């Protein structure tokens, strides 16, 4: 089948590569325009554009696809059998959605209708979900409301951050899309008519889950509140990787990976760390107080409940380092409290 691929970030790349390596024909790629890098003010391609150019696929980069009729017509003139949208970053006009005979399809990184919208992976982690996944759905005008062709579940490992889980879901999407395209092709083999595919679709309103929207992340959410529970702080650090931060003497410090020192993690801690680490589970402290700086490991911080072990972090303008090195960089010692 002839496909126009719409995507922008790193998440989309394995799916595009899977299509390129299949028997399908990617006749065009639509992605976000080049952006200027803060260092050096150099224009850089999106990850998807880089792969498309490497494979000699025509690329279109609209600023706003809904307002650019010439680019819309160029896309329609490609005469694709279907559109495939994976984290493109703009809302497509109905003219584009309806133009291919086999419709426009989207890969969404959640188990719809839970976490429709812009930040499904982060919201799932922040809320403590134990399960996420991907959906391949037929697009319509509503935000992530279309009927579902395929859904794949994926367990959330609480010790993997949002970048790692995003990579997991991207890989899952790359294999699942080939399965989905085969379903679409075999269902419409003789007519190339979308009507033939409808019996295989599941409407979201019959799924046993109320719709929940993954609203856009706010700046305030990235600041760690040490007066919250250890597990909640851990989910903030892992879910908003690599941008969750705290402050010390007015300077911002990003924290990248962590382990809550709670009874539920005691077996994991005992199996992976020196025995004395487990003793901090019962240590009382003030929220944000440094309880220990441990060579070759990290530092332990008090919260409103159990302490939390910080494993990696980053000063402003520096590279990410292990938390014990970060502690030296910012001169942490027992008793110091984050702002």
Swiss-Prot record:
The keyword Transcription is assigned to this record: no
- Report the top EC class in one word: transferase
Which pairs of Cys residues are joined through disulfide bonds in the record?
A: none
- Cited InterPro entries: Fmt, Formyl_trans_C, Formyl_transf_N, Formyl_transf_N_sf, Formyl_transferase-like_C_sf, GART_AS, Met-tRNA-FMT_C, Met-tRNA-FMT_N
Pfam families recorded for this chain?
A: Formyl_trans_C (PF02911), Formyl_trans_N (PF00551)
Listed EC numbers: 2.1.2.9
Q: Provide the Gene Ontology terms for cellular component.
A: cytosol
Q: Please indicate which superkingdom the organism of origin belongs to.
A: Bacteria
So what does this thing catalyse?
L-methionyl-tRNA(fMet) + (6R)-10-formyltetrahydrofolate = N-formyl-L-methionyl-tRNA(fMet) + (6S)-5,6,7,8-tetrahydrofolate + H(+)
Q: Write out the entry's keywords from A to Z.
A: Protein biosynthesis, Transferase
Which sites bind (6S)-5,6,7,8-tetrahydrofolate?
A: 110-113
Q: What exactly does this protein do?
A: Attaches a formyl group to the free amino group of methionyl-tRNA(fMet). The formyl group appears to play a dual role in the initiator identity of N-formylmethionyl-tRNA by promoting its recognition by IF2 and preventing the misappropriation of this tRNA by the elongation apparatus.
Q: Which family does it belong to?
A: Belongs to the Fmt family.
The record's listing under NCBIfam families reads:
fmt
Question: Which protein is depicted?
Answer: Methionyl-tRNA formyltransferase
Annotated organism of origin: Prochlorococcus marinus (strain MIT 9211)
């Amino acid at each position: 089948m002839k496909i126009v691929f719409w995507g922008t970030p790193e998440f989309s790349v394995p799916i595009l590569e899977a299509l390129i390596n299949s028997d399908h024909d990617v006749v065009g790629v639509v992605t976000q325009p080049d952006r200027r890098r803060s260092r050096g003010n150099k224009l850089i391609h999106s990850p998807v554009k880089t792969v498309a150019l490497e494979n000699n696929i025509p690329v279109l980069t609209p600023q706003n696809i809904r307002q650019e009729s010439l680019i819309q017509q160029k896309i329609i003139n490609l005469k694709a059998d279907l559109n495939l949208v994976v984290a493109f970053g703009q809302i497509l006009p109905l003219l584009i959605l309806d133009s291919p005979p086999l419709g426009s399809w989207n890969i969404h990184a959640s188990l719809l209708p839970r976490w429709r919208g812009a930040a499904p992976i982060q919201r799932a982690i922040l809320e403590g979900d134990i399960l996420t996944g991907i959906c391949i759905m037929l697009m319509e005008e509503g935000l992530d409301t279309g009927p579902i062709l395929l859904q794949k579940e994926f367990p959330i490992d609480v010790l993997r951050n949002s970048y790692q889980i995003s990579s997991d879901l991207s890989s899952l999407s790359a294999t699942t899309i080939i399965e989905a395209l085969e379903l679409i092709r075999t269902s419409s083999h003789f007519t190339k008519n979308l009507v033939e595919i409808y019996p295989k679709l599941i409407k979201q309103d019959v799924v046993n889950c109320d719709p929940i929207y993954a609203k856009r992340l706010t700046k305030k959410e990235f600041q760690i509140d040490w007066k919250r529970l250890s597990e909640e702080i851990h989910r903030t650090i892992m879910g908003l990787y690599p941008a969750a931060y705290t402050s010390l003497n007015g300077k911002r410090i990003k924290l990248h990976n962590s382990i809550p020192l709670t009874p539920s993690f005691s077996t994991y801690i005992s199996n992976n760390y020196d025995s004395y680490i487990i003793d901090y589970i019962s240590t009382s402290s003030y929220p944000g107080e440094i309880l220990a700086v441990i060579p070759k490991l990290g530092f332990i911080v008090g919260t409103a409940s159990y302490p939390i072990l910080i494993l990696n972090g980053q000063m402003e303008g520096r590279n990410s380092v292990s938390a014990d090195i970060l502690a030296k960089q910012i001169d942490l010692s027992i008793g110091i409290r984050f702002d």
